[in-house]
Amino acid sequence: MGCIKNENATQAETGQNGLDFNPYDIMEPRAPGKTPKNMQNGAPVKTHDVAPQGVYQPDYNILTPHMRSPEYVQMSTAAAITLGVNKGRMYRCSCTRCLNLLLTYPEGCRANCAYCGLARHREAERDYADRNFIRVDWPAVPMDVIVDKVASDGAGSPFHRMCISMITHPRSDDDTVAVLKKWTSRIDPETIPVSILSNPTTMGREDVKLLKDLGADIFTVALDAATPELFDRTRGKGVQSPHKWAKYWEVLEDARDIFGPEKFGVHLIAGMGE
C-alpha cells in the first residue's frame, strides 16, 4: 500500500524558464519601512523594564522582559532542548552537538540586512527577543544557568562545541569577551572548543587577537552575500545598513593571520542573486 497519490501533475521546467526561478531584478530588497519613534531601540521593553524570571520563551502576546548580554544570551531551540531548558524531541537524533549562543539586547541588532529576521526594520513588529532567527524560536537563558548545566555534565556533556554569535551593537565586542570568560572559567575549552561568529563592523585586529588569547578555537565571518555588489545591496547602503565588504574582508584576513589554517571560515548564502 502506498501513500502517494498521482494527481497527473507534471514537473515544472527548471532553469530560467521555470516557475521557481527568481530573476535578479525581482529580488530587489524592499526599502526599509519607517519605525515609529516609540518603537525604536527597544523603547517599550526599556520603558516598562520588566525583570526577567529565569528562562524566557518567546511569546508574542506579552511584553518581553528587560534582558541583556552578558547576563542573558539566546540559544537555538535545538540547543535549548539538548540543554534541558525546553521540552521537546528532535527527529532521528537525541541532541545537537553545538551550543549556539546569541547575544541579546532590547535595542536588538542595529544592522538592517534585507533577509534577516533580526534586522532593524523589523523592530516595530516584535520585541527583539521574540523575533524569529533562522526559522525557529531562540529562547533567552541566563548565562549562569547555561554554564552551571554544562559544567555539571563534565565529560558527559552532549555538546562538542560552543559558538558565540555576535550582533551589531555597541556592547557586542565587550560582551562577547565577558561571555567567553564566563564559559572558560568553568569549562575547559580543550574539552568543548569555542567558535566565534563575528561582527566585523565593530571589530579590529586586536579584538580578534583577544578572543584567540582567551581561548576561542575558530573564528568565522558571515559574508552571506557572495559578491561586493550583492553584499552592498542586501547588507550595506542598499538597505541603510552599516556593513561594508572591505571591512569584512579585513577582519577575515586578520583571523587568517591570528587563528591560522583551518581555524577561520566564511558563511555564504546561496540564492541571493549571484
Model-derived features with residue positions:
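Surface-exposed amphipathic alpha-helices with a cationic face
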Residues: 180-189, 212, 252-260
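Core AdoMet radical
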Residues: 121-145, 152-175, 190-207, 211-249, ...
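N-terminal [4Fe-4S]-dependent radical SAM core
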Residues: 3-7, 18-21, 28, 33-112, ...
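Short, catalytically relevant binding-site loops at active-site mouths
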Residues: 227-228, 271-273
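Short, electropositive alpha-helical surface patch
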Residues: 176-185, 220, 273-274
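Short, conserved beta-strand edge motifs with alternating hydrophobic and charged residues
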Residues: 265-271
